[in-house]
UniProtKB/Swiss-Prot annotation:
A molecular function (GO) term: 7S RNA binding
Domain of life where this protein originates: Archaea
Protein name, per record: Signal recognition particle 19 kDa protein
Subunit structure: Part of the signal recognition particle protein translocation system, which is composed of SRP and FtsY. Archaeal SRP consists of a 7S RNA molecule of 300 nucleotides and two protein subunits: SRP54 and SRP19.
Organism for this UniProt entry: Methanosarcina mazei (strain ATCC BAA-159 / DSM 3647 / Goe1 / Go1 / JCM 11833 / OCM 88) (Methanosarcina frisia)
Annotated function: Involved in targeting and insertion of nascent membrane proteins into the cytoplasmic membrane. Binds directly to 7S RNA and mediates binding of the 54 kDa subunit of the SRP.
Gene Ontology BP terms: SRP-dependent cotranslational protein targeting to membrane, signal sequence recognition
This protein's UniProt keywords: Cytoplasm, Ribonucleoprotein, RNA-binding, Signal recognition particle
Localization of this protein: Cytoplasm
Annotated GO CC locations: signal recognition particle
Pfam families for the chain: SRP19
Family label: Belongs to the SRP19 family.
Magnesium among keywords: no
């Protein structure tokens, strides 16, 4: 059952190693390599999005890989929230965050 007011963030959405057709929804410049559920959860927590982790779920485009997913508060467009989460993970990893253009 779908939770009202929640967005689903799959690791594939922000994974730099995935193509757009494989599920990535943000640019390669803003995405990160192989994001983990715990990193997504921590970044969403820092952004005040009240994350809920569901580790047993599999992304429909790659149903054979159990990657898990994170439910976050719906505070705007999914692509914007995914980008914010990816940039927060980059900061946590100590990577350079691209300048706004």
């Amino acid at each position: 059952m779908k939770d009202k007011g929640k967005l689903v963030i799959w690791p594939a959405y922000i994974d730099q190693t995935k193509s757009r057709s494989s599920g990535r929804i943000i640019s390669r410049k803003n995405s990160i390599k192989e994001p983990h559920l715990n990193e997504i959860k921590e970044a969403a927590r820092q952004l005040g999005l009240n994350p809920e982790v569901e580790p047993e779920k599999a992304y429909p485009k790659s149903w054979w890989e159990v990657s898990g997913r994170v439910l976050v508060d719906d505070n705007g467009p999914k692509s914007v929230i995914a980008k914010q989460i990816a940039l927060a993970i980059k900061k946590m990893r100590g990577q350079e965050v691209p300048a706004k253009t």
